[in-house]
Amino acid sequence: MNKPLLSELIIDIGNTSIAFASFKDNKINLFVKMKTNLMLRHDEVFSFFKENFDFNVNQVFISSVVPILNGIFENVIFSFFKIKPLFISFDLNYDLTFNPYKSGKFLLGSDVFANLVAAIENYSFENVLVVDLGTACTIFAVSRQDGILGGLINSGPLINFNSLLDNAYLLKKFSISTPSNLLERTTSGSVNSGLFYQYKYLIEGVYRDIKKMYKKEFNLIIAGGNANLLLPLIEIEFIFNIHLTVEGIRILGNSIVF
């Protein structure tokens, strides 16, 4: 039996996890992750592909913020699919419906770049604030008219949580959860409150300030694997899209001008 043809595999190599998404008829029909490990071997990645990707692809597009793993994935993909993947980055030329770098190119992570492109290309918004809560918390603004406006980068919730546990002698490991109240009475509850309310106020504060700064309305899109516990606290209308980054990588991969 011939394997069904799925034309595109998108890979997002992040600091904490590596996301894989296959697209068929412009829709994601498979989304899986593996933990990022700087010591990953060729045979481990090949076994993961064999277990999860029993299909053919025409193209593989990759965004990577862990360059040490790029060679392994390039070799495995060639061994498995017999094709060479395309790595997207901010400094390539793309045929998009808007100019991301209207005021000139500047260094930007490929994952952040993908988020911002997807926010404009996949939605009918003119101005968007994009929040990605992963290993890092990135908050960037983008405009269809003016391109990428800039942003903020902070450590993500789990980084802050683990740093606190590592440096506070009496704090013991416990599960994080969405706080029930702003003011909690137990140590674990207070840590949860402090952890998530700081991001609530950061996101809502930046959102209010950029509206004043640019005198324009902005839509809010939230992405990232660590966002789900924060979402109930956000009091601004938003769209949550867990697949925003892979959607952006796919758009960029198909828009590269050679």
From Swiss-Prot:
Catalytic machinery residues: D111 (proton acceptor)
Reactions that this protein is recorded to catalyse: (R)-pantothenate + ATP = (R)-4'-phosphopantothenate + ADP + H(+)
Primary subcellular site in the record, as a coarse category: cytoplasm
Binding site residues for K(+): D132
A Gene Ontology BP annotation from the UniProt entry: coenzyme A biosynthetic process
Pathway(s) annotated for this protein in UniProt: Cofactor biosynthesis; coenzyme A biosynthesis; CoA from (R)-pantothenate: step 1/5
Leading EC class: transferase
CDD domains: ASKHA_NBD_PanK-III
EC number: 2.7.1.33
Keyword terms of this UniProt record: ATP-binding, Coenzyme A biosynthesis, Cytoplasm, Kinase, Metal-binding, Nucleotide-binding, Potassium, Transferase
Residue sites binding ATP per the record: D12, I13, G14, N15, T16, S17, I18, A19, T135
Localization annotation: Cytoplasm
NCBIfam families found in the cross-reference section: baf, PRK13326.1
PANTHER family given in the database record: TYPE III PANTOTHENATE KINASE (PTHR34265:SF1)
Quaternary structure and partners: Homodimer.
UniProt family annotation: Belongs to the type III pantothenate kinase family.
Name listed for the protein in its UniProt record: Type III pantothenate kinase
Gene name of this polypeptide: coaX
